[in-house]
Amino acid sequence: NMHTIYGAMQAGVDIVAMGAGIPADIPKYMRDMAEQKPIDFPISVANATQDYFLKFDPERYKTDTDLRVPRFLMIITSHILAQRFKKHVVPPDGFIIEEPIAGGHNAPPRTPGNKAVALDETGQPIYTARDHANMDTMRSLDVPYWLAGGYGSKEGLARAKALGARGVQIGSIFALAEESGMAEHLKQRVISEIRDGKGIDVYTDPLASPTGFPFKVARLEGTMSEPDVYEERDRICDLGYLREAAEVTFVGRDGKEKKTVVYRCASEPIDDYLRKGGKIEQTIGRKCI
């Protein structure tokens, strides 16, 4: 979102890290915004019959303060992407490489010939050596990188540095911090089970996220991680963080077909989603996360 990035630049942030999709052109957009140049930012719209853009003009929000361009770290999963985007018009300043066990969303396993993703006996995606970045290749690129996914400890940091990384990205541990948005009673239950040595069963759910990407789910009794609880919950999309834009056709008052763009979410009420052109199979197992 250009408005969010521009606001962050006005606040003087030092670093922007991003990985949703492939944000290859963000460094260029930040440079253009610092120079007060207007931007046509392409928007991904499902079922689009034309190209869509968000027009952003920094002059509209200009302040007296000169803006500097933050450093940009691109979150990726593969050394192949690092090789590719190091040569980009305005390359990133570094990379964050996420392993398949990283929390939150994960890239799906790479499958030859676009075959369907294989699942293990528990229903989790099967990751192989193809899904891990080659550290020898990363070292050879002479670009700083950080590692993520199972590195959130003193030992993990040492392991990452031994692999040539500048440091690590940690996220899951902060979900248990005082400032996190997790419900306090759930947070305390997780902390308690970790302290007691029981640990938490974390499951890579291929269906939970409305985006369709695998998503890490902590299995806790009484939460939507349990199928029975999920089935009893009302479907809802009240925040819209993971909505997608979609082009739909409707009949206007004049009786003519028209096209418009709507926002939809595969975790919203099914009838609403279908009315916006969504497919029923995309709603199976989807949760508001």
What is each model feature region?
Residues 92, 97-144, 152-154, 162-289:
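Conserved active-site-proximal phosphate/metal-binding subdomains
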Residues 1-140, 155:
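Active-site entrance/lid segments in N-terminal catalytic domains of soluble metabolic enzymes
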